[in-house]
């Protein structure tokens, strides 16, 4: 049985929509709506996977943020200090005049890792957050 489709409206910046349109055209989607549905499915799968992080985990959180946004660099650092027991190392590079990339390497309890990731994601001015986890070596 086919599901009923709901019509929604979304406001996006021009550059984001143009990039999205280029991607869906290149991938052969029949419509923008199909590309959006696929993107939402991917987002839901990622969120559900991330929500199920339990036990000891190792991995990285990669973030890109605008360091010119008032207080953001300090907020990123404060969050890292709040989870210093988990963080084994971090790398910070300057991508351009305004943007920085940080890779945070961690080893610890999955629920705390998820909490740290969500706090970083919620900061205004953070443009990208990617969490990658793996079980510790002894479980592989």
UniProtKB/Swiss-Prot annotation:
GO biological process, one term: response to nickel cation
Gene3D superfamilies: ACT-like. Chain A, domain 2, Met repressor-like
DNA-binding keyword on record: yes
Keywords: DNA-binding, Metal-binding, Nickel, Transcription, Transcription regulation
Cofactor note: Binds 1 nickel ion per subunit.
CDD domains with a match to the protein in the record: RHH_NikR_HicB-like (cd22231)
Cofactor(s) recorded in Swiss-Prot or TrEMBL: Ni(2+)
GO molecular function, one term: DNA binding
Residues at which Ni(2+) binds: 81, 92, 94, 100
Record Pfam families: NikR_C (PF08753), RHH_1 (PF01402)
Function: Transcriptional regulator.
PANTHER family listed in its UniProt record: NICKEL-RESPONSIVE REGULATOR
Similarity comment: family membership: Belongs to the transcriptional regulatory CopG/NikR family.
Protein name per UniProt: Putative nickel-responsive regulator
Organism: Methanococcoides burtonii (strain DSM 6242 / NBRC 107633 / OCM 468 / ACE-M)
